[in-house]
């Protein structure tokens, strides 16, 4: 299940680095709950509809912006919806004006709606970030998907996820989150699996840290 949010923006400038503010909105709308600290079977996209203005170090939204929130558990989104109804204000003057439910897709090729983060644990609790062109990227992307399937109680052991850079724009990015520079991929992805598997990825996202704004797909 996925909610598409239509946001009012009257000439608003949103700083380039605003992902933490988006996470803050999600947590505000959730309120006290049992989801914090659990495996993040939800995802949310970047704000769209704006224009980058380098001189102002931000993104200009003339009239409106949109983004989506997806989750494998409908109760999660019901709580989000209640939170929005109680307090639709976001940040930088952005206000949610309308929420609609998006239809589920029936396909295997998807496109990024936020950068995809892949992390592999190294020695001394350090992590290596993998990018879409790395030789082990698809293996790690698939393992991550399998963990999400296990957490959601879906048995599809043959399911795979892979980057498909030839299907559209593919590039590397460096995303700052709380001062940490994350090497991430912006690339189409292909998911081979059952309809339930594809739906889980559509809602919960791919890769690591979907709960803080990475790995949403459309």
Kindly give the residue locations of the regions a language model identified:
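RNA-interacting cores
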Residues: 1-218
């Amino acid at each position: 299940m996925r909610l598409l949010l239509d946001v009012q923006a009257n000439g608003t400038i949103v700083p380039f680095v605003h992902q933490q503010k988006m996470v803050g909105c999600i947590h505000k709308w959730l309120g006290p709950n049992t989801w914090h600290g659990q495996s993040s079977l939800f995802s949310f996209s970047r704000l769209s509809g704006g224009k980058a203005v380098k001189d102002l170090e931000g993104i200009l939204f003339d009239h409106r912006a949109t983004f989506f929130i997806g989750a494998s558990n409908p109760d999660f989104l019901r709580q989000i919806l209640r939170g929005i109804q109680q307090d639709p204000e976001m940040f930088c003057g952005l206000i949610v004006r309308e929420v609609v439910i998006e239809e589920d897709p029936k396909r295997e090729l998807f496109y990024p709606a936020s950068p995809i983060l892949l992390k592999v644990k190294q020695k001394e609790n350090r992590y290596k970030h993998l990018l879409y062109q790395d030789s082990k990227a698809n293996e790690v992307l698939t393992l991550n998907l399998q963990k999400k399937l296990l957490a959601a109680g879906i048995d599809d052991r043959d399911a795979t996820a892979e980057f498909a850079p030839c299907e559209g724009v593919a590039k590397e990015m460096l995303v700052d989150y709380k001062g940490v520079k994350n090497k991430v991929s912006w690339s189409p992805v292909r998911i081979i699996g059952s309809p339930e598997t594809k739906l889980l990825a559509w809602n919960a996202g791919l890769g690591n840290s979907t709960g803080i704004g990475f790995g949403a797909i459309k």
